Design a protein with these regions (language model features):
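N-terminal, polar/charged subdomain of small-to-medium soluble alpha/beta proteins
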Residues: 1-125
Length: 125
C-alpha cells in the first residue's frame, strides 16, 4: 500500500518516569508513515482532496506539545489516534525517539503501527 511520510518532527513535551526527567520539556523526534489506499488516485488526478494534507503535522504536534506523559509509548498512541481521525488514512506507523537519561545511549524509542480495526480487549499480560 502506498504511504506518505513525515520525518523529523520535533515535538516538545514533558515525558519520563521520574519527576526530574519530566521537570523540563524535552524535544521528541517523531516520524510518521501514513498508509493511504487512495494515494495512487491522488497522484493520477493531481487532486489534493484525495490525499492527506501536510497540515496533519501541525495537528500531531498540537496533540502532545506541552503535555506530560510517563511513557513515549503513550505519546505514540496519542499521535496514532490523531492520524487515524483522517478518513483517508487506513493505518499508521509512528516512531517516537527521545534522549534518555542514560549515559552512552544516544536515543531510546518506540515504533507502533495502528489501524482502524478496534483494539479489542486490552487485558494486561
Amino acid at each position: 500500500m502506498d504511504s506518505l511520510f513525515l520525518e523529523g518532527l520535533e515535538v516538545p513535551c514533558r515525558v519520563g518516569c521520574s519527576d526530574p526527567e519530566r521537570a523540563t520539556p524535552q524535544s521528541l523526534r517523531v516520524a510518521v508513515r501514513l498508509f493511504c489506499p487512495g494515494l495512487r488516485y491522488a497522484g493520477i488526478a493531481d487532486d489534493l482532496e484525495r490525499t492527506v494534507d501536510y497540515r496533519l503535522a501541525g495537528e500531531l504536534i498540537d496533540a502532545v506539545q506541552g503535555r506530560e506523559y510517563l511513557l513515549i509509548e503513550r505519546v505514540a498512541e496519542v499521535l496514532a489516534e490523531v492520524a487515524l481521525k483522517n478518513p483517508l488514512v487506513d493505518h499508521v506507523t509512528i516512531s517516537v525517539r527521545k534522549r534518555p537519561p542514560v549515559q552512552g545511549l544516544e536515543w531510546a524509542g518506540v515504533e507502533i503501527t495502528r489501524g482502524r480495526e478496534p483494539a479489542g480487549d486490552l487485558q494486561r499480560a
